[in-house]
């Protein structure tokens, strides 16, 4: 499977480590995965001056045009994201779909290992949505909804048994 990771603003701490860790992690569920890095500018129209945040959905629209040869395109930004009705989001995806975006703005930590773990969890979570997985009631599952860092830190980076089965079923259908 070919994934493209688009660094939206070029200021993603530890980007190479994120790509390596994410590629290794999702290969456990998707088989051989290759992640290609690209860079892109944040779309100006996505920025809300009132909120000081970027509209996540607008970034998904930008990613849609980058699909090309890739099975999935995931954006990564250091800017804070929001969705209508929410103060912020760690990420957003088309469910099901081919595009997802994650912000590292609220995932940063002085401990580089904790930061890497958080980013991989949120990338995995949003990737799961692109394969049609919804939020999971199992609070340890990577597909559980997180509205705080505490919830991100609490959950596992892994899919629970139920979500793994759903993922495999959706992959067999052509994902």
UniProtKB/Swiss-Prot annotation:
| An annotated Gene Ontology molecular function | zinc ion binding
Residues that, per the record, bind Zn(2+) 1: 125, 129, 135
The family database entries (SUPFAM superfamilies) matched by this protein are listed as:
Metalloproteases ('zincins'), catalytic domain (SSF55486)
Give the domain of life. Answer: Archaea
Q: Which residues bind Zn(2+) 2?
A: 136, 141, 160, 163
Q: Biological process GO annotation list?
A: proteolysis
Q: Which residues form the active site?
A: 126
Which key words are in the record?
Hydrolase, Metal-binding, Metalloprotease, Protease, Zinc
Task: Name the cofactor(s) required for activity, per the record.
Answer: Zn(2+)
Q: Quote the cofactor binding remark.
A: Binds 2 Zn(2+) ions per subunit. One is catalytic, whereas the other seems to have a structural role.
Q: Which InterPro entries match?
A: MetalloPept_cat_dom_sf, Pept_M54_archaemetzincn, Pept_M54_archaemetzncn_arc/bac
Give a short account of what the protein does: Probable zinc metalloprotease whose natural substrate is unknown. Does not show endo- or exopeptidase activity against resorufin labeled casein, p-nitroanilide (pNA), amidomethylcoumarin (AMC) (one to three amino acids in length), and hippuryl-aminoacid substrates.
The record's comment on protein family reads: Belongs to the peptidase M54 family.
| Assembly behavior | Monomer.
The identity of this protein, by name, is Archaemetzincin
Organism per entry: Methanopyrus kandleri (strain AV19 / DSM 6324 / JCM 9639 / NBRC 100938)
| Species classification | Archaea, Methanobacteriati, Methanobacteriota, Methanomada group, Methanopyri
């Amino acid at each position: 499977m070919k994934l493209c990771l688009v660094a939206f603003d070029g200021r993603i701490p530890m980007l190479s480590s994120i790509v390596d860790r994410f590629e290794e992690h999702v290969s456990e569920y998707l088989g051989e995965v290759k992640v290609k890095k690209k860079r892109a500018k944040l779309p100006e129209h996505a920025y809300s001056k009132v909120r000081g945040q970027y509209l996540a959905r607008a970034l998904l629209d930008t990613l849609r045009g980058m699909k090309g040869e890739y099975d999935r395109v995931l954006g990564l930004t250091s800017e804070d994201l929001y969705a209508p009705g929410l103060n912020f989001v760690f990420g957003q995806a088309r469910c099901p779909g081919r595009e997802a975006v994650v912000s590292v703005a609220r995932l940063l930590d002085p401990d580089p290992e904790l930061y890497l773990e958080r980013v991989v969890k949120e990338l995995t979570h949003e990737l799961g949505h692109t394969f049609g997985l919804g939020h999971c009631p199992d609070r340890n599952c990577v597909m559980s909804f997180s509205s705080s860092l505490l919830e991100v830190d609490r959950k596992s980076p892994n899919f629970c048994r139920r979500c793994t089965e759903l993922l495999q079923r959706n992959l067999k259908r052509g994902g």
